[in-house]
């Protein structure tokens, strides 16, 4: 999964040559857990922000035609906002993205029942989807990896499922999202990112 946001020439020269990953407070969960925001900057001055709550892509800042950094991804300014609003801004969706009709399916001859949360169907794995969970974060050079252990039966899905979502900001101005998962049983794994883009930028 790769998002390419390229400019022919970069005008933000004061950050040129600097690559960094910074961590800061981003609020607390309803359980009182501390939420962190990770800001990744490449050598061209492009900025990507992600959070360990929901492994969410919060913002992507690129220079506009006047060289002013502009956010082209819709998101919130505080971690608490992601817990009370439901447009799924930037969220990591899983185990399953989209709808499962009647909130049930058959796997290996067994009926699997999920929680209905939209007109009798299961949308984005229900009210306890990956986007509402805290993820373990590991910072790397120009990247942040988020890990989650989804135990057997979580959201109703079978199998212990260990998943990693890695966000990378490259020096050719690409945001890359890499998914990796392993389960000890046959299960459903249909993950995605739910970002909304406004390429004109927003405040």
Question: Model regions: which residues?
Answer:
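Extreme N-terminal basic, low-complexity initiation segments
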Residues: 2-7
